[in-house]
Design a protein with these regions (language model features):
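Flexible, polar/low-complexity N-terminal or interdomain linker segments that lie immediately upstream
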Residues: 1-41, 137-154, 356
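Positively charged, proline/Ser/Thr-rich regional signature most characteristic
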Residues: 22-92
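Short glycine-/polar-rich loops that comprise or flank the Walker A/P-loop
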Residues: 43-44, 146, 234-239
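Catalytic cysteine-centered active loop of the rhodanese-like fold, especially the PTP/DSP P-loop
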Residues: 73-127
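Glycine-rich phosphate-binding P-loop
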Residues: 108, 147-167
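Long, charge-dense
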Residues: 125-138, 255-259, 269
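Conserved nucleotide-sensing/catalytic segment adjacent to the nucleotide-binding pocket
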Residues: 167-234
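Conserved NTP phosphate-binding and transfer environment spanning the P-loop NTPase/kinase superfamily
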Residues: 234-239, 244-357
Length: 357
């Protein structure tokens, strides 16, 4: 008969620090609740909850009000009937090196690590859990100021399309799952700050330290999340390139991006329009609704660009000075021009690029 999980609360334990745990050879197992995992998790980790949210809340209450022994006893009674099922969900990964984590490197991850070890798994615990990972990420982000080439231009000019195609780029909107506009969440599931920062760290921490990185010009906030302060500062100091394209080209690209032809998309777009009344006035918003209902999408987009997006862009960028201006009518040619500009940049100096200077 298999021992109860409480028998694995003490004993020898193999553990590693965050920097080791993030190596590609590790398979990360998050034993926190699905709610905790959703709120913030190490990118790529697999969620195998030991308890659900209600059970965890109950155990925590017992721990605070009665004591550790009562909490452990209740936790064991919850887990025991499900232990075989829990184990079976992890069997497909038995040949891999597993790293188990919970919130702070406490009882959940320790007991599971020892239990899996007794079952023949190669397994280790992440010291300090997700909290230690968050510290690690934030320590990196607070000083991350790489040399940047920042693409600017009006809405629809093709900045995001170029960022997706350029080597050595960071797609902030993809990391945030938001296009950084009033309609930016259509077709997407915006991420929260913790998950955005985790993915940002994963994308940037292994990049060459002195090479210029392409990034799209953004405000500090992208949808629901904020760009790390040090990186936002690097964007202000980076090489600035202005991209230009005709109204016709911009409308076509926006239409291809949003493809507002299905009923659900049209409903989401129409639901956002009332938020524009203060900027555009009631009459223009009603005109936009009419065009949407008539499937006159090109006219709909043109009015939004002329009356909303372009004036806001001109106001926000009026004091900018650019290192280069490029046509973005032919994105393949623009990409070649940008790569040429990148190649012409000197490798960032010997001084640490993360410094404040």
């Amino acid at each position: 008969m298999r021992p109860l999980l409480q028998h694995f609360l003490q004993g020898q334990l193999s553990s590693i620090e965050v920097s080791e745990a993030l190596q590609p050879s590790n398979t990360l197992i998050d034993v926190r609740t699905s709610e905790e995992h959703f709120q913030g998790a190490i990118p790529g980790s697999r969620n195998h909850p030991l308890f659900d949210g209600l059970e965890r809340s109950l155990i925590g209450k017992l721990y605070r009000q009665v004591g550790r022994e009562a909490a452990v006893e209740r936790g064991t009674s919850i887990v025991a009937p499900q232990l075989e099922k829990f184990l079976n969900t992890l069997r497909p990964f038995q040949s891999r090196l597993l790293t188990v984590y919970c919130a702070r490197g406490g009882m959940r991850s320790k007991s599971v690590t020892r239990f899996l070890s007794s079952e023949g798994f190669r397994v280790q615990q992440l010291e300090g859990g997700y909290k230690a990972y968050r510290r690690h990420v934030l320590d990196f982000l607070k000083d991350f100021r790489p040399p940047l080439i920042v693409l600017h231009g009006r809405t629809g000019v093709g900045k995001t399309l170029l960022i997706r195609s350029l080597p050595g780029s960071i797609d902030l909107e993809n990391l945030a799952q938001h296009r950084s506009s009033i309609f930016g969440a259509v077709h997407l599931q915006p991420r929260n700050q913790k998950n955005f920062e985790g993915l940002f760290y994963s994308k940037t921490s292994s990049k060459p330290r002195k090479e210029f990185i392409f990034v799209e010009g953004e405000s500090r906030k992208v949808g629901q999340v904020f760009i790390p302060e040090a990186f936002a500062d690097a964007m202000k100091k980076g090489k600035k390139i202005l991209l230009k394209a005709s109204m016709e080209t911009r409308v076509r690209r926006i239409l291809e991006e949003y493809h507002p032809r299905d009923e659900e998309t049209l409903f989401k777009i129409e639901a956002i329009l009332p938020a524009l009344k203060e900027s555009l006035g009631k009459n223009v918003v009603e005109q936009l609704k009419t065009l949407l209902h008539q499937n006159k999408f090109e006219d709909f987009i043109t009015i939004l660009l002329e009356k909303y997006y372009d004036p806001r862009y001109e106001h926000g960028m009026r004091d900018y000075q650019y290192d280069l201006e490029l046509s973005a009518e032919d994105l393949e040619q623009t990409q070649k021009d940008l790569i040429g500009f990148h190649s012409a940049q000197p490798i960032h100096g010997d001084k640490n690029q993360y410094s404040q200077s």
